[in-house]
């Protein structure tokens, strides 16, 4: 018989930097999960990702306190900020532009994000990422 899922925990942890301090420790501790076991497994799986990149993770906690986790791709906003070379998006995106991204950069980000997007094809994924870029106050060229 399959194990019963007790809880889902959604966190955003930097790649290769999971440790028992907040936010990881308290979130897992309240469900009785072995925190160090998660940290070691997460850090091992994120070795191939650029250190410091935020990685969304969904942890499924079972009734016997065991767990599994699924990693997602880094947020589009993080990838867009890195591509545009900026620290943060605009506070007034419609009037104040803070950077530029071109179609090639959007395609690269869309390729990275494709597993997590609901887009049917690459062009739809690029348009989705372009919308995120505009909402952050970036000028989008070539879309």
Swiss-Prot record:
Quaternary structure, from the entry: Part of the ribosomal stalk of the 50S ribosomal subunit. Interacts with L10 and the large rRNA to form the base of the stalk. L10 forms an elongated spine to which L12 dimers bind in a sequential fashion forming a multimeric L10(L12)X complex.
SMART domains cross-referenced by the UniProt entry: RL11
Known function: Forms part of the ribosomal stalk which helps the ribosome interact with GTP-bound translation factors.
Domain of life where this protein originates: Bacteria
Keyword list, A-Z: Methylation, Ribonucleoprotein, Ribosomal protein, RNA-binding, rRNA-binding
Source organism of this protein record: Teredinibacter turnerae (strain ATCC 39867 / T7901)
Family, similarity comment: Belongs to the universal ribosomal protein uL11 family.
CDD domains: Ribosomal_L11
PANTHER family, alphabetized: 60S RIBOSOMAL PROTEIN L12, LARGE RIBOSOMAL SUBUNIT PROTEIN UL11M
GN (gene name): rplK
GO cellular component term of the entry, any: cytosolic large ribosomal subunit
Sections of the chain in a coiled coil: none
Protein's name according to its UniProt entry: Large ribosomal subunit protein uL11
GO biological process, alphabetically ordered: translation
A GO MF term: large ribosomal subunit rRNA binding
PTMs per UniProt: One or more lysine residues are methylated.
A Pfam family per the record: Ribosomal_L11_N
